[in-house]
Design a protein with these regions (language model features):
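Short hydrophobic/glycine-rich mini-motifs in sensory/regulatory modules
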Residues: 149-159
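Extracytoplasmic/periplasmic sensor domains and loops in membrane signaling proteins
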Residues: 91-134
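Short N-terminal helix-loop-first-beta-strand/juxtamembrane motif that initiates sensory/input modules
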Residues: 62-84, 178-200, 214
Length: 218
């Protein structure tokens, strides 16, 4: 009986050890499935928001929006033949389309956001902000964008963050492209930037870069 109990104890110990190892392997496998990998699968599937893991991709952007206090957090991809692509030649002014939208009221899939200089800058690897603020329903926002990298080290999309800046823009309306006094800066800022405005540009760009790195393949 004692021998039987000892044998049973050994079997149970081995079974427990195997179970822990198996769980560990599953956790490691899940950790390997990062946001960037899922995004590549989304675009390659051609299924748009019917893609099985779309909700999980959006949920991650929702968390970012809630954590940092942005009005909108979303992802843009370059347009190719009317669809979002994983590659583009930025020597041309390629339009960008919205894909995963972490907003409370998301835009439709592949809405065309046109071309702006900061889209190209981010796609080429440099986090960049818009040259001016803009009017939102809840006040003024400043937008910034940063590259998200895939497994091969190439940019697969850009993360956009629209951050509220109404308090600052109230004192500098010329930095709001929707204001009658707008200074007209679109691609290059050729004048002096007030310290408070520069702080908004820098902080929004840093946010976009921080979260884009979190989404990138590790």
């Amino acid at each position: 009986m004692k021998k039987y109990l000892k044998l049973l104890a050994v079997v149970l110990t081995l079974a427990l050890a195997f179970s822990v190892t198996a769980c560990g392997d599953k956790e490691e496998a899940a950790a390997d499935e990062c946001w960037a990998d899922q995004y590549v699968a989304l675009i390659e599937s051609g299924e748009a928001r019917d893609f099985a893991d779309y909700d999980a991709l959006k949920e991650e952007l929702d968390k970012i929006r809630e954590e940092c206090g942005a009005n909108y957090v979303y992802v843009l991809s370059p347009e190719k033949d009317g669809e979002p692509a994983l590659e583009c030649d930025t020597s041309d002014k390629v339009d960008f389309l919205i894909t995963v939208d972490g907003s409370a009221d998301p835009d439709d899939w592949a809405v065309n956001y046109g071309w702006e200089i900061q889209f190209t800058e981010a796609w080429d690897g440099t986090p960049a902000a818009a040259r001016s603020a803009w009017d939102d329903e809840e006040g003024q926002c400043w937008s910034a964008f940063a590259p998200v990298y895939g497994e091969d080290g190439k940019v697969i999309c850009i993360l956009g963050i629209d951050y509220p800046c109404g308090d600052t823009i109230a004192d500098y309306p010329e930095w709001n492209r929707d204001d009658a006094s707008w200074n007209g800066f679109e691609e290059e800022i050729t004048g002096d930037v007030p310290e408070a405005v520069q702080a908004v540009i820098d902080s929004t760009t840093e946010l976009a870069d921080k979260y884009a790195k979190q989404l990138s393949h590790k």
